């Protein structure tokens, strides 16, 4: 695999990707090497999609007067098990979105999917493999395996994140201020991240910290 658009990797993981030693995102995540270059994801997941979940204008008073920045909440995924989440801030909306996308790529995880519902038995990876919970601020989200054909039983924000992750069927339960999109999306991502933690060896996951 050759470098894309003149990318010259600076990390060991990036070099292994360019040299063809690592040729899948799952292999990269299981390598134990920290993911610090978004270009790694660009190379290994060319079909990655992004979804802007929320855009907010944030005002702050400084010595020079009122400063305005935009905060964007973004999720990225390939609809086949890979999902990332991040927030980005910038003076311009476009800049905030791009920052969030780049950071979300560095936060990408491989969700543990399966046919985890006792009501089903198809053996396809259409739902989460196990019950999981996630929390962000006052919001708590619980995801439970569901039988094939149920669909995504949850709010719009939850559905957008789960669709990008490749989850087709799910039972959800949420509490707290779920109208706050940023916390609702982050709690959902944290729940999915817990499924990844449950199956990845500790020595590998200890370096996978979510970037703020």
Curated annotation (Swiss-Prot):
Stretches assigned to the S5 DRBM domain: 48-111
Pfam family, one: Ribosomal_S5_C
Any one annotated GO CC term: small ribosomal subunit
UniProt cross-references to SUPFAM superfamilies, sorted A to Z: dsRNA-binding domain-like, Ribosomal protein S5 domain 2-like
GO molecular function: rRNA binding; structural constituent of ribosome
Entry annotated with the keyword Cell inner membrane: no
GO biological process, one term: translation
Key words of the record: Ribonucleoprotein, Ribosomal protein, RNA-binding, rRNA-binding
UniProt note: domains: The N-terminal domain interacts with the head of the 30S subunit; the C-terminal domain interacts with the body and contacts protein S4. The interaction surface between S4 and S5 is involved in control of translational fidelity.
Subunit relationships: Part of the 30S ribosomal subunit. Contacts protein S4.
Biological role stated in the UniProt entry: With S4 and S12 plays an important role in translational accuracy.
Family listed: Belongs to the universal ribosomal protein uS5 family.
Protein name according to UniProt: Small ribosomal subunit protein uS5
Gene name of the record: rps5
């Amino acid at each position: 695999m050759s470098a894309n658009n003149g990318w010259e990797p600076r990390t060991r993981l990036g070099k292994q990707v360019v040299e063809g030693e690592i040729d899948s995102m799952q292999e990269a995540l299981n390598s134990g090497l920290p993911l610090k270059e978004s270009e790694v994801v660009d190379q290994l997941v060319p079909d990655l999609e992004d979804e802007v979940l929320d855009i907010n204008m944030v005002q702050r008073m400084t010595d020079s007067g009122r400063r305005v920045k935009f905060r964007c909440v973004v999720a990225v995924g390939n609809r086949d098990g890979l999902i990332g989440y991040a927030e980005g801030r910038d003076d311009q909306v476009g800049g905030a979105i791009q920052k969030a996308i780049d950071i979300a790529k560095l936060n990408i995880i491989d969700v543990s999917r399966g046919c985890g519902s006792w009501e089903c038995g198809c053996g396809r990876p259409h739902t989460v493999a196990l019950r999981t919970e996630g929390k962000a601020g006052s919001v708590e989200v619980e995801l439970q395996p569901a039988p094939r054909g149920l669909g995504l039983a949850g709010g719009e924000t939850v559905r957008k994140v789960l669709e990008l992750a490749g989850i087709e069927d799910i039972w959800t339960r949420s509490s707290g201020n779920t109208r706050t999109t940023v916390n609702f999306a982050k709690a959902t991502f944290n729940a999915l991240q817990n499924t990844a933690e449950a199956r990845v060896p500790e020595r590998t996951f200890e370096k996978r910290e979510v970037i703020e």
